[in-house]
Every structure is written in structure tokens, then in C-alpha cells.
Amino acid sequence: MSSRGTVLEAERLVVGYAGAPVCGEMSVAVGAGEVLGVVGFNGAGKSTAARTLAGRQLPISGEVKVHGLLANPDAVAFRREVSAVFDEDLFFPSLTVREHLLLVARGHSLPDPEEQVEEELSFFGLQERADVVPESLSSGQRRRTLLAAGLMRPASLLILDEPEQRLDPVMREALGRRVRSLADGGATVVLVTHDPQLLLDTATSCLVIDDEVTLATPEVAAAIIAGA
């Protein structure tokens, strides 16, 4: 546990749909500056667990807290503490990439919002697509736009659900450095991934999701997904 204190706590958490669990019970505490990797086979329940940790859906039982605030889709104070990126996240169809990012920057009162947006466009290689609407983007470009928006938001907890999907190797490596830098700055990160190298580059501990949920070192977790 980080000496800077616990940020995310999940206590006897069971996740699933319509009362049916998708994986085993889990309990975990993650501190400031730590990166929790989440791994498991396809369909094991990783994304469901991540959505529950993000407060996007309610657990079947147990609880999730961030800085002591109980997770709930309707809890405004909780949502302010969390930035999450999921593949199903939506865009405003009439806004361009730049306009989306400016909306995030201004909505969170970031200093120099235009400058920060330009930095994100550059980091994710979106400068040439900055003034087009989402329907004109490739799936990879949409993914990078979602990541740019998620990483811009000031939050105690950042949750990334398979962020490596549709990213080339160079961008995956850059994303790993960015995640590590955010954690070094005090952010708590939950990283759902199938990428062993991204896990090794970023994670400080891991959850292995299956019928039973276990804690593992990044090295053990990376070996599990490399052999999947």
C-alpha cells in the first residue's frame, strides 16, 4: 500500500448482471501512486469489474469507495473523483475532436485549456483529424480521442479498460509512459489489459479475474496473459 494513503477500496465486491455474478468475490485496496492491473481470459468479467469500480453500475453485493465516497452512478461527488475510459463511451455527434476536448478542459476548469488540448492532440497524433466529427474518424482515432479526454480529466482515480486496443506499438509504449507518469504524480490507476508489456511497464500489483479473484505480481499476471 502506498505511503500516500488508500484511494480505492473494494470490499467483498461481487459484480455481474441481473443478480448473476460473472466472477468471484474481490477485495482490494489501492493507494495513491499505484497502478492496479486487471487481467483474465475473455469473458472473465474484467470490464464488468472495471465499470463497477468506476461507479458505472451497481455491484450485486459489497461496496466500492474512492476517498471514502461510496460508488453510485448517481453520486456526483464520487464521479468527480473518477475518470474512466470504456470503448462504449459516446461522443456528441455534432462536435469535432477539438471541440470535444475543449469541452472536457473547460468543464473541468483546466488552466490554458486550448494549450492543453493541443498537447493532447499532438500526443495522440490527432492534429490532422482535430476538426472533423466522430463519424469521420477510424475506430483507432475514436479510441485515441476517448483516451485523450479521459487522461485530461483531473481525477484521483483513472480507470482504463483495455486502452491498448487499436493502438500501434509506438502509441502503446507512449501510453505506458503516460500512465506511469500520472501514477508518479499521485494518481491511482486501474488498468484492464491483455498486453503483457504494458502491464509490466506500469502495474504495481494485479488482480487476476476468474471464478476466484486473486492478487498477483505484475510478472505473474503478465505470464498468465502471455500464455492465454
Where are these predicted regions, by residue range?
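Helix-to-loop junction immediately C-terminal to a conserved catalytic motif
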Residues: A54
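H-loop/switch region of ABC-family ATPase nucleotide-binding domains
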Residues: T193-H194
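Catalytic Walker B motif of ABC-type/P-loop ATPase nucleotide-binding domains
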Residues: L158-E162
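Q-loop/switch helix immediately C-terminal to the Walker
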Residues: L95-G107
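Conserved ABC ATPase "signature" region
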Residues: L102, D112-R129
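ABC ATPase C-loop
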Residues: G150-L151
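Conserved ABC ATPase signature
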Residues: V133-L137
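Conserved ABC transporter NBD signature motif
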Residues: G62-L70, F78
